[in-house]
Regions:
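Internal glycine-rich, Lys/Arg-flanked active-site/core loops of soluble domains
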Residues: 59-211
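N-terminal Sec-dependent signal peptide, specifically the hydrophobic helical h-region
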Residues: 2-23, 293
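Compact beta-sheet-dominated globular domain cores
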Residues: 219-274
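Extracellular/luminal ectodomains of metazoan preproproteins built from arrays
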Residues: 24-51, 56, 258-277, 282
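Cleavable C-terminal sorting propeptides in eukaryotic secreted/cell-surface proteins
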Residues: 275-297
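Short coil/turn segments at secondary-structure boundaries
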Residues: 174, 199-200, 216-218, 259-260
Length: 297
């Protein structure tokens, strides 16, 4: 009997060795000002951009060009309609349309990765954005949704949390660095929710431009606050051994682009003006490593 058990154990060990082992390798990424991010705030052209999307059929074209995007939009559109009929959507700010709500549902569903993957790198040039970025309408609707909801969120700033697995982030200049996420960044008001997504890198963030989208997100239980690509943070604390961060909003924003789809170019300078609601623009002369979304494999 013992020899039979030993033989079986040996056979099982061989079988295990033959099975490909799936393992996520730890990634390394630097946090900086995300210079190649597409970070348009549509300042001063909010209505004109909406009219342009409508008159050119831009959204319909992009949906027809991407089956997964179309599927995600149609599913979100159905969910948004059901929530409106059920009365589960809270009072919305003036100017907030169905497209804004649907964009939030698309992003927080299964589409955040695709959008952010494009957003992080398509800011190389206006031409690159115009010719290769497949989610121009979605980017506009999501950006505007956050801007409209921002004022209704906290009435000020709020502490949120973000966890990531299989990736170690490092600030470009250590403690005291100035950074942007350069993408739409999901966070939670609850620390335990953020820890569920990982703690290989963990962020405690004071955001002043993030928008409370919990009641409109695909999963309402995550207490989600979504931070726009252009909010600027100071790294006020960084533990390089545990890869934990404390980020504090500067209450300023920085964009390399504005009204690009309508012909706007790249500004040459970044002006900072405290808490004013107008945009601030940042000129970029050198490349940098843009952070990854979650680092999951």
């Amino acid at each position: 009997m013992r020899s039979l058990v030993t033989a079986c154990a040996s056979l099982w060990a061989v079988i295990l060795l033959e099975i490909p082992q799936v393992r996520c390798e730890m990634k390394e990424a630097e946090l900086n000002m995300a210079p190649w991010s597409f970070d348009d705030q549509y300042s001063g052209c909010e209505d004109r951009m909406a009219e342009k999307i409508s008159s050119t059929g831009l959204l319909e074209t992009e949906l027809n060009n991407d089956g997964k995007f179309k599927e995600a939009w149609q599913k979100a559109e159905q969910t948004w309609g059901e929530r409106k009929r059920n009365g589960t959507i809270p009072a919305l700010p003036p100017g907030f349309t169905d497209e804004h709500g649907i964009a939030i549902l698309v992003y927080t569903g299964a589409f955040y990765y695709r959008l952010n993957e494009a957003v992080r790198w398509v800011g190389v040039s206006p031409q690159d954005y115009m010719e290769t970025f497949p989610y121009k309408a979605l980017h506009y609707y999501l950006t505007r949704a956050l801007q409209l909801l921002e004022k209704n969120c906290f009435g000020g700033c709020q502490t949120v949390y973000r966890g990531a697995k299989n990736i170690h982030f490092t600030p470009s200049s250590g403690k005291g660095s100035t950074i942007r996420f350069g993408q739409f960044t999901s966070t939670s008001l609850k620390k335990d929710v953020a820890l569920f997504f990982g703690n290989d890198s963990f962020f405690t963030i004071k955001t002043c431009l993030g928008a409370c989208i919990a009641s409109m997100a695909a999963l309402v239980t995550e207490n989600e606050v979504l931070i726009p690509p252009y909010e600027i943070f100071n790294v006020t604390n960084f533990n390089k051994d545990e890869h934990t961060f404390v980020l504090t909003s500067t209450e300023m924003r920085c964009s390399n682009y504005n009204c690009t789809y309508l012909g706007g170019g790249k500004p040459n300078a970044c002006g900072h003006a405290g808490k004013k609601p107008s945009p601030w623009f940042c000129g970029v002369d050198s490349p940098g490593w843009v952070p990854v979304v979650l680092g999951q494999c």
